[in-house]
Structure formats: structure tokens, C-alpha cells
Amino acid sequence: MKQTVYTASPESQQIHVWSLNHDGSLKLVQVVDVPGQVQPMVVSPDKRYLYVGVRPEFRVLAYRIAPDDGALTFAAESALPGSPTHISTDHQGRFVFVGSYNAGNVSVTRLDDGLPAGVVDVVEGLEGCHSANISPDNRTLWVPALKQDRICLFTLSDDGKLVAQEPAEVTTVEGAGPRHMAFHPNQQYAYCVNELNSSVDVWELKDPHGNIECVQTLDMMPADFSDTRWAADIHITPDGRHLYACDRTASLITVFSVSEDGSVLTKEGFQPTETQPRGFNVDHSGKYLIAAGQKSHHIAVYAIAGEQGLLTEKGRYAVGQGPMWVVVNAY
């Protein structure tokens, strides 16, 4: 298995393309100059394209991925109805979802043979919309509205329309600020990192009665932490054994172990990392975590090891200015 790491640096308007070696080291393949401040990124399900959101002219750009080394070539673009904060796709590669924090909306862009072909739906009124996360069965879009302390639930129709479910939302505790999400590979549980109180909620997707329930909430910060809480990102290993979440004020990554059924998290430890970690990701082997420091202008690679999933730094690399997003492609 070959893997490529992509990092987005909006201040220098660059994407750095790295080859991830089996020992966890990175080799620079390409630096792409992007026509705008590049932030969110996602790889298409068929691994042929990288989709990126740019501002101040709000667009989604599609880059064709070279199958030999992961290098990028611009392929197409499409306008967006708001500044892109988060970008994702459905599992079939038919639609791109873009959440916009500033515009308070989520949009659906149709894909035509992998290329963006225009917006087909927009849902407004989602204050602080921070991500759009398709469920493992490709039917439900979970959309955290950070400023409203709720996660809105939409059914994805065949033509890309979003239809509010019943119930239409689940709510967090007041002031939590739901932000980003990850799903357990068993498709039974979802995890949401809350920005404003730096906690993680565990959501049971469907209980025996068809309800969605929060079954656990964990503080992700050290007991003696007293500064402003400012959580950012969350990811789970492919085997579902370890979960990670980061806080930007503390510049740390919290390590959780996950119970076999996915319902219970146990806080195992903390890893100091790059200054103001806005984004990170886990590779497809589950052996490495790559974190970006928005204020250090570096990325760091960590080895994931042991039953606890604790992190050991393997190396750090200079990237562009203000790196905010990390994605990993395997082929």
C-alpha cells in the first residue's frame, strides 16, 4: 500500500504533497500553488480526485490525483454559496457537501464523473455550521451547528436534496459547540468533538427503539487546565481501537481508547504537539498520525503504538504558512 499526505496552508495558498513511507517518514513530492486560500480538503471515494475549498472567491476545486505518486493536476471548479469551512463526500462519490461557518449553511454539489458540476441544494439557518458528515450507510448527513449547540440530521435523496429527518436534530449541552465528527467502523456509534468546552460526545446511531442517544460525554483536557478551551478536530483509527482529538489553546492531542463495541471511550493520555493544531489525520494503516500546527507552520508525524494508542513523534516538517488541513490517500 502506498500513501500520500496532503496538507493545506491557506496563508501561503499552497498544498504540499508528501509520500508517507512505511517507517513514518515523509518525502516531499510536490508543492501546488492554489488560486485562493485553501482550507478544507477531501479525497474522492475512488481516490481519483482531491476536492478543496478556497476563499475569498468561494469555490470547490477538483485536482486529479496521479496514481503513481499522488501528484495533483487541476481538473475543474464550481462556485459555492458560502465560505467553505469543511468539505466531504458521500460514499458513492456522487455529491460533495460543504459546510460554511460564516454563511450558516450546508450545500450539496453534484459530481459528474468525479468533477464538480454545480450546487443542487442549500440548507440555510445553521448558525456556525462547522462540518457535514455522511453516515456509514450513506443515508443521513450529520451537520453540527456550533453556535446553536445542535447537530442537524438530513436524509440524502437520490438527487442530492437534503430532507430534514424526524427528529430533525440532536442537541448537546449548552455552550458545548459541536464541531467535527468521526464514525466507528462498526457503524453503530459516532463521536463529536465540541469546540467551546473541549469535550467529546459519543452518539449511539440507533438504539433498539430507533432513537439517537448521547451515551457518554468526556472532558478531553487535563484536570489542571484552566485556560480558554478551543478544540478542533477528531479522528478514529481504521480498526476502531483508538480515537484522537486536539485542542488549539493547549496545543495537545488527547488519546482515547475505544471499547470493542464502540460505546465507551477511556482517556489514556495527552501528546504535546505543534502550536495551535487546527487539523490532523490518521493514515490508512492505523500506524501513524499527522498533525498540522497553524502557528508553527510545521506538520509532525507520530507513531501509534500499544494497547493505549499513545503517540511517539517520528519527525516534523516545514510546510506552507498557517497549515490547517491534513488528508491521507491510500492506493
UniProtKB/Swiss-Prot annotation:
It is an enzyme of class 3 (hydrolase). One of its GO terms (molecular function) is 6-phosphogluconolactonase activity. It catalyses: 6-phospho-D-glucono-1,5-lactone + H2O = 6-phospho-D-gluconate + H(+). Transmembrane segments: none annotated. Its EC number is 3.1.1.31. It holds the Pfam family Lactonase. GO terms for cellular component: cytosol. Keywords: Carbohydrate metabolism, Glucose metabolism, Hydrolase. InterPro entries: 6-phosphogluconolactonase_YbhE, Cycloisomerase_2, Lactonase_7-beta_prop, N2O_reductase_N, WD40/YVTN_repeat-like_dom_sf. The keyword tRNA processing does not apply. One of its GO terms (biological process) is pentose-phosphate shunt, oxidative branch. Pathway: Carbohydrate degradation; pentose phosphate pathway; D-ribulose 5-phosphate from D-glucose 6-phosphate (oxidative stage): step 2/3. Catalyzes the hydrolysis of 6-phosphogluconolactone to 6-phosphogluconate. Belongs to the cycloisomerase 2 family. PANTHER family: 6-PHOSPHOGLUCONOLACTONASE, 6-PHOSPHOGLUCONOLACTONASE-RELATED. This is 6-phosphogluconolactonase.
